[in-house]
């Protein structure tokens, strides 16, 4: 398997195929970095330390689950004197356990399938799919344009019943478009 196959199927750049292994319903690709360089200055003369071996989930191949296994390095650059973890561009964040391409595919299919159907197809937990959806929505609505808002409406809603489980939610909306600008706890 070439590095071109890694990129074309999974959008993984800068890594090359070492070996692969099959077990029942699983394909595990062992990959390694082609060249290690400082992400800050681009220097290739860096000292590396292997911190751990990671296994992340990729897009399935047919009915087989695909996993990628690789070493994660800590880098020290003598040129810019920075010490940092290597950047993994095919992950959405440092602690992600699946590739960006798998996350994107799950989110695209979520528009047409139920969470339970996605979980069965990709062998994921329900909470994993729900968290992906929450993160995508928070990224989408992180910055709401308020420059064109001329009039707002503020609602305070009582949530819960009784004294222990009750509270208020404050909702701020654009009165013209009806878009929610802010949702906050308490009054």
Regions found by a protein language model. Name each.
Residues 116-131:
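Short, basic interhelical loop/turn and adjoining N-cap
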Residues 43, 123, 134, 138:
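Residue-level detection of the helix-turn-helix DNA-binding "recognition helix"
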Residues 1-88:
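Short, conserved DNA-binding cores of transcription-related domains
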Residues 81-102:
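Short, Lys/Arg-enriched anionic-surface-contact patches
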Residues 132-187:
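RNase H-like nuclease fold core
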Residues 38, 77, 118, 152-158:
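Short, conserved catalytic/metal-binding motifs centered on acidic residues
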Residues 98-113:
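Short, amphipathic alpha-helical "recognition" segments used to contact nucleic acids or chromatin
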């Amino acid at each position: 398997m070439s590095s071109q196959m890694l990129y074309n199927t999974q959008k993984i750049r800068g890594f090359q195929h070492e070996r692969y292994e099959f077990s029942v319903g699983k394909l595990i690709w062992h990959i390694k970095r082609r060249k290690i360089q400082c992400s800050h200055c681009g220097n290739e003369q860096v000292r590396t330390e292997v911190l751990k071996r990671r296994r992340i989930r990729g897009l399935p191949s047919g009915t087989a689950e695909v996993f990628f296994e690789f070493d994660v390095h800590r880098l020290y650059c003598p040129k810019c004197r920075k010490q940092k973890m290597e950047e993994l561009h095919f992950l959405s964040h440092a602690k992600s356990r699946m590739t960006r391409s798998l996350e994107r595919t799950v989110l695209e299919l979520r528009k047409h399938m139920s969470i339970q159907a996605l979980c069965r197809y990709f062998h994921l937990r329900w909470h994993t799919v729900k968290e992906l959806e929450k993160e995508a929505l928070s990224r989408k609505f992180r910055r709401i344009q308020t420059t064109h808002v001329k009039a707002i409406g503020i609602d305070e809603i009582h949530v819960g019943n009784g004294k222990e489980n009750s509270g208020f939610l404050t909702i701020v909306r654009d009165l013209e478009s009806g878009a929610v600008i802010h949702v906050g706890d308490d009054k």
